[in-house]
From Swiss-Prot:
Lyase in keyword set: no
Reactions accelerated catalytically: a ubiquinone + n Na(+)(in) + NADH + H(+) = a ubiquinol + n Na(+)(out) + NAD(+)
Source organism, top-level taxon: Bacteria
Keyword entries, A-Z: Ion transport, NAD, Sodium, Sodium transport, Translocase, Transport, Ubiquinone
Record-level GO BP terms: sodium ion transport
Pfam families documented for this protein: NQRA_2nd, NQRA_N, NQRA_SLBB
Purpose: NQR complex catalyzes the reduction of ubiquinone-1 to ubiquinol by two successive reactions, coupled with the transport of Na(+) ions from the cytoplasm to the periplasm. NqrA to NqrE are probably involved in the second step, the conversion of ubisemiquinone to ubiquinol.
HAMAP family: NqrA (MF_00425)
Stated name of the protein: Na(+)-translocating NADH-quinone reductase subunit A
Entry's Gene Ontology molecular function annotations: oxidoreductase activity, acting on NAD(P)H, quinone or similar compound as acceptor
Amino acid sequence: MIKIKKGLDLPIAGAPAQVIEDGKPVTQVALIGFDYNGMKPTMEVKVGDRVKCGQLLFTDKKTEGVRYTSPASGVVSAVNRGERRVFQSIVIDIEGDDSEQFAQFSPEELPNLSREQVVENLVGSGEWTALRTRPYSKAPAIDAEPHSIFVTAMDSHPLSADPAVIINEAKADFKNGLVVLGKLTRGKVFVCARAGVNYDLPSGSNAVQEQFDGPHPAGLAGTHIHYLDPVNASKFVWTIGYQDVIAIGRLFTSGRKSVERVVALAGPMVSKPRLLRTRTGASLAQLTEGELKSSDVRLISGSVLGGRNAKGNVSFLGRFANQISCLEEGYKREFMGWLSPGSNKYSLLNIYLSKLNPGKLFNFTTTTNGSERAMVPVGSYEKVMPLDILPTQLLRSLVVGDTEMAQKLGCLELDEEDLSLCTFVCPGKYEYGPILRDSLTRIEKEG
């Protein structure tokens, strides 16, 4: 077991009850372009076309052969683009339950499949896009082979669902998915779990379980990779979420694309925080109808630390999101707030009275408590960074655009979510995730 000491478990109110209930039916789903870094689509459908679940919607110009398929049966109602025609989302009005049929195998046949059979089925169904490379966090090339694969079977995000609850409902599918993933690498398939949790892994496979303990980010793939199989510019690993492993297991044994997704609906503004069974790309406005304490709420697809503001053309559940976080919009300004003793405010530093009550939970809002200012190194980053890197120096290199120094300091190991705590504790209010993404894009482009 690997124990993480540095990090931060955000004391936020509204944690979900770990009980799965059926969510409200939704009539719209969408595939969000921002979920796929560096992807440039070539559309194969247009508004008004009828599609089946699993049918091809578009391919990626930059990664040849990678297919993005429909998460529902219905009619394409919108293809949304932003400035400079950047692809935002493709929306489907759900009608019927028609599905494309893919290759189907019995569980006994899975260990004997070839790598080519596995790749063909994953690519054809669109489940290939559940895999992400590290470095760069992109859909892998079809002919690529990773040094190892990391299954994130734990979640340390604030307000997250317990993966064990979801996996225990689909043990057979999870095992079948691990068998399939094992065909993609000659290395190990690391199943990373919370301390004290033991999953039933398939015998005779290359799947091994590793346990992590400690505060967030103990549950992030970047942390697991750093300690178990570090990457560099010429060494790649792949990551995948536990619910996508279940979906892959179902795909290979049923021949149909699985779009079920269990998410945590949680946060200070949720009337009844709990786990909901819904579908990939579900409309969050429809899913959360009647669930919120007020209308002035920001819906976040994903974690409060690194999720996406779900509004407008992207008001849908993200491809890799396992939670819906709901926070009150922080419009209100507090007169002379910097002079208050802060009994109801939280800070990592010992500057508020609330530190005298360490078990207190807070109703966080979206306010940043101030405007952007200079980056001040007061030791906050070091307190929340468990990786063996120099966070202040790395962040400074990213901010000034020194990609050469950033590579030397370890930026290739990181994804946006790995710097989300640094963003939260930053006195200068910097958003380090987008800054890291810009640097990674430049590094990949320039070599």
